[in-house]
Structures are given as C-alpha cells and as structure tokens.
Swiss-Prot record:
UniProt organism field: Arabidopsis thaliana (Mouse-ear cress)
Repeat keyword on record: yes
Start and end residues of each F-box domain: 19-65
Signal peptide stretch: none
Taxonomic lineage of the native organism: Eukaryota, Viridiplantae, Streptophyta, Embryophyta, Tracheophyta
Name of this chain's protein: Putative F-box/kelch-repeat protein At1g60570
Classification via Pfam families: F-box, Kelch_FKB95
Cross-referenced InterPro entries: F-box-like_dom_sf, F-box/kelch-repeat_ARATH, F-box_dom, Kelch-typ_b-propeller
Disulfide bonds: none
Length: 381
C-alpha cells in the first residue's frame, strides 16, 4: 500500500494512553486548535492519542469548523470500474505526504449505493445522489463529515439519468422521466433544503414535447439561470421570475462535450478535443474564447485522452487518462490517472488566463481500461 493511501481507521491500532501533549486544556480550546488544521491531516492526527481520535472522529469538530468559518474545499471523486455500476470507489484529492504534488487517496465508504444513471449534487458538506435505474425516485445523502449514507425524502417522479443543480438553497431536477407518461408540470421538480419537501415546477416552454419529456437532460448554472440541454434543443429557466426562454444548442456548440465541462465562479469552461484547448463561454458576446496559456504545457499529454474538468475552490482541476501497454506489447491492459491544477485569473481586458501550477499522476495504482467518472466535485468540510 502506498504511503499516500488511507486505510480505514479500524485497522490502525491506537497508542496506549500516555501523558497528554496538552494535558489541562479544555475541550473547547482543543477543538478551536484542531479546527484550524486542514481536514486532510485529521486521519494522521487521530493517531496521536485517544483524545484526539475521539474528537476528530466525532461530528463535533465539523460543527465547530462550520460555525467558526474554518471550512475548506475538498475534492471528492467517484470512479466506476464496470458498466453495471456495481463496482465503484471514492477518492479524495490531497497533497502527498512525502513529496510535492497531489494524490487521489481512497476513502473507505461502506454500503454506498450505485451512482450509475443518477444525478449528483454537492451542498455544503453533503453530496446528494438523486434518481437512478433502480428506485428512480430515491434520494440519498453522503455525509462527508462521517462518510455515511443517509436517506432523504423521495422525489415525486421516478427518474432515470436526470440532471440536477443547486440554486439559492434549492435543488432543481429535470428530465429522465419514465416512458409512457407526459406531464409538463412534472418534468422539473425542486427540493427545498430547509423544508425538505419536493414541489413540481411547470415547464412553460414549447420546446418540451412528448419525445423530449423522456430525454436525458444536462443542466448548467450560469448567471443565476439554469441552462437545460437535451438532444439538439435547449431552454433557459430563470427561477427568480419563473420565466422560460428557448436556446439553440449550436449557439453554444455543446452537443459533444457537455459532459466534460464545468462552471467556476460563474464562468462555463469546456475542453475542445479537436483543438486540444480549454475554452470559456462569453455570455455577453455569445461565443467561446480560449483560456490563454492554459494548455501550453499539457498538449502532448492529453492527446487521445479522456478529459474531465472540475472546480476546486476557484481553481480548475483537469483529469485525464493515459493507457499503459501490456507486457507483451500487444495492446493496453491498464490506465493511469493524471491531473493538473490550473489557477485562473481574469485580466483587465476581460480575457481569462490559466497557469498550470502542477500536473502529474494521482493514482499510485493503475485502474482498469473500463472506467468512468461518476462524480467529481468540491464539498466544504
């Protein structure tokens, strides 16, 4: 096992209680000190003594961090290793222990439901899993404090491959409705995080037809509006005034690469394979613009690779794969996962520059050829 992998805590033997490093400090003061330490160091700190272990494995430390404003962004990644969706593993991106750079460290999460054909949304320190092939109305929550799954109120409709997004404390879900029904008032529904209730949202766009009602949709949140795409059509929904506008998909040229884009600080980014370029969408000019200097160092690495972009606390994280040849030289048998950390900066002229701060392999062990990203996103813990 690599030094950067994190085995379950139950496999680690806690040291015999010895004279405490800070013997007489009250618990609240210890919590205040530990809350200022990066969450990524908690697993190591929990081995120092039993008292640290007790505090760092309880929910109290995270409640203290949240109330005191010491939360930080942690990037969670879920990879699926089969077409059935039954074999998937969770990882967290963190800095290496003994060298510079990053690694995807495995997270021990038991009884994890299949995420295949579901929509995943991060809300604070929680990750919502919505819909799916089996029990399509179900909603589950991964508590990133305890890494335990909880159940949430079910949706009103069963949905297979829906799309969801968070807007002003509410989760909006569209599409994926089961065939054999058509009801524009149920194509979209919204979950209020405060009241924990689901309500339907009537779609008033003439773009919604019987055929598109069952299509898989993709949602993007830009400028407080929900951009919803399916097939070759799209609509824009503004929840503030409950208005719907039509959108031509060719206008944004997103038919093929929609699944690999991300929104960072209200700007939409996408990777264009033919040009091996990262671009951002200028909503005022309604055109794509290149991320200046963003891909210069990475061109030779991402050619013929599968690329995924994600927001990581205002920076862009780019994952891509690299095939590993078999020993006999007759093809490939494994893949390696690589990652780049890209800082973003907007100039006075309105252009956006990208600076590659680091790139390298992030999984110490190779992964199967057949894999897919089920989820990549930041949570606050």
């Amino acid at each position: 096992m690599s030094d950067d992998e994190e085995p379950p805590l139950k496999k680690n033997k806690l040291p015999v209680e010895e004279p405490t490093l800070i013997p007489s400090l009250p618990e609240e003061l210890i919590l205040s000190i530990l809350a200022r330490v990066s969450r990524l160091s908690y697993r190591s700190l929990s081995l120092v003594c039993k008292r640290f272990h007790s505090l760092l494995t309880s929910g109290e430390i995270y409640r203290f961090r949240s109330l005191s404003g010491y939360t930080e962004n942690c990037l969670y990644v879920c990879l699926r290793f089969s077409h059935t969706g039954r074999s998937h593993r969770w990882f967290m991106l963190r800095e290496k222990n003994k060298s510079s750079g990053y690694v995807l460290a495995p997270i021990p999460i038991s009884h994890s439901p299949s995420l295949h054909a579901s929509s995943i949304v991060a809300v604070g320190s929680k990750i919502y899993k919505i819909g799916g092939v089996m029990d399509g109305s179900s909603v589950s929550i991964l508590d990133c404090w305890s890494h335990r799954w909880l159940e949430a109120p079910s949706m009103q409709m069963e949905r297979d491959r829906p799309s969801a997004n968070l807007i002003d404390g509410k989760i909006y879900v569209t599409g994926g409705c089961h065939r054999g029904s058509y009801n524009p008032s149920k194509w979209m529904e919204v979950f209020d995080l405060k009241t924990e209730t689901w309500e339907p949202v009537l779609c008033r766009s003439d773009r919604l037809t019987f055929e598109s009602y069952h299509e898989r949709t993709n949602n993007l949140l830009v400028d407080g509006k929900l951009y919803i795409f399916w097939a070759d059509k799209g609509v824009v929904y503004n929840p503030k005034d409950d208005t719907w506008d039509s959108l031509e998909v060719p206008e944004m040229d997103m038919c093929l690469t929609l699944f690999y884009c991300c929104v960072i600080e209200n700007v939409l980014y996408d990777f264009f394979y033919e040009e091996l370029d990262i671009k951002w969408y200028d909503t005022k000019a309604r055109t794509w613009r290149s991320l200046l200097n963003g891909m210069r160092e990475l061109h030779k690495f991402v050619r013929h690779a599968s690329v995924t972009l994600a927001d990581y606390g205002g920076k862009m994280v780019m994952f891509w794969d690299k095939f590993v040849a078999s020993g006999d030289g007759l093809g490939f048998h494994k893949t390696m996962m690589w990652c780049a950390m890209i800082a973003l900066e907007r100039s006075d002229s309105g252009e956006i520059w990208g600076k590659v701060e680091w790139f390298g392999p992030v999984l110490p062990n190779q992964i199967p050829l057949e894999y897919a990203f089920e989820y990549v996103g930041s949570v606050k813990v």
